Swiss-Prot record:
InterPro entries: DUF3631 (IPR022081). It comes from Saccharopolyspora erythraea (Streptomyces erythraeus). It comes from the Bacteria. Residues 230-239, 253-263 have a biased composition (Polar residues). The keyword Glycoprotein does not apply. The keyword Transcription regulation does not apply. Keywords: Plasmid. The given protein N-terminal is putative, as other possibilities exist in ORF1. Transmembrane segments: none annotated. Residues 183-263 are annotated as: Disordered. Coiled coil: none annotated. This is Uncharacterized 28.9 kDa protein in xis 5'region.
């Protein structure tokens, strides 16, 4: 799944709007499984995972096996892929670092040969590339890392008329925009930058309180939280009272006394 680029919008999950569809689906699943619960509780499916991951995924695999068709295969593939994605976080950070370093290496050059790009990457002693493998980052490893962003080498022509395997800076624009801090040369000419927009916290945006993971979430939204549409109104406060009249909270405000000329 690619990261959202500036200017792209993704429809948010709305608990109040989407909950009824999920509730209806849950009821249908419960009715379908209810008659088979004794058999399902005794099931011991073949798991592609081990330890805690297997414990987490086993109920879903059991339901998939019960459904039949291609669901057993799809469920097991999803379990393996999602576990691999979680374990790939560190590798993902490495790929992002590669994008940043490639941007530095390109500068304003429209093309770079693979040899020159590798020379610049491996010449940075503070980067991980000189020690990436036994001899540092090579062409095959560079190609594999960049393929995750749909960036591939090709025969490129240089200003002096020569040709060699290399990369075009324009092919990095999309990945730089999605995964790296914004910079002027991250965008093709004529494409303006998209200003970032602050977003409200999920609880404020959806009009819901955050769930503590223990208590049952309240189905009713908190009226004091903003629902993301109407302008929030200022909380009501008791008005100030004049001197000599009853104050707030049932407390009388003592009348003022004139101390001038007192004996």
């Amino acid at each position: 799944m690619r990261r959202r680029a500036p200017g792209e919008t993704v429809a948010p999950y709305r608990h109040r709007g989407d909950r009824r569809h999920l509730t209806a689906l849950a009821k249908r699943l419960a009715a379908w499984l209810r008659a088979s619960m004794p058999d399902l509780e005794r099931a011991e499916p073949d798991m592609p995972l081990e330890d805690r991951a297997a414990d987490t995924w086993e109920p879903l695999i059991i339901v998939a096996d019960h459904a039949g068709g291609d669901w057993p295969t799809r469920a097991r593939n999803a379990a393996v892929d999602l576990l691999a994605e979680a374990a790939d976080n560190d590798q993902g950070s490495l790929r992002t670092r590669l994008l940043v370093d490639c941007r530095t290496a390109f500068g304003d050059h429209p093309t770079l040969s693979t040899t020159e790009l590798l020379r610049q990457l491996n010449s940075d002693p503070e980067a991980p590339w000189p020690t990436y493998g036994k001899t540092g980052l090579n062409a095959a490893k560079l190609s594999k890392l960049l393929a995750e962003f749909d960036i591939r080498s090709a025969n490129v022509r240089f200003p002096d008329g020569t040709q060699a395997k290399g990369y075009q800076r324009a092919h990095f624009f999309d990945a730089w925009t999605r995964y790296c801090p914004d910079a002027p040369h991250d965008r093709p000419e004529g494409v303006p930058s998209q200003p970032s927009q602050a977003s409200h916290r999920r609880s404020e945006r959806d009009g819901l309180t955050l769930w503590d993971g223990i208590s049952r979430p309240n189905d009713e939204p908190d009226p004091d939280l903003w629902d993301g549409t109407s302008r929030p109104t200022a909380p009501s406060r008791p008005s100030l009272t004049c001197i000599g009249t009853a104050g707030t909270a049932g407390t009388d405000t003592p009348p003022s006394t004139n101390t001038k000329g007192a004996a």
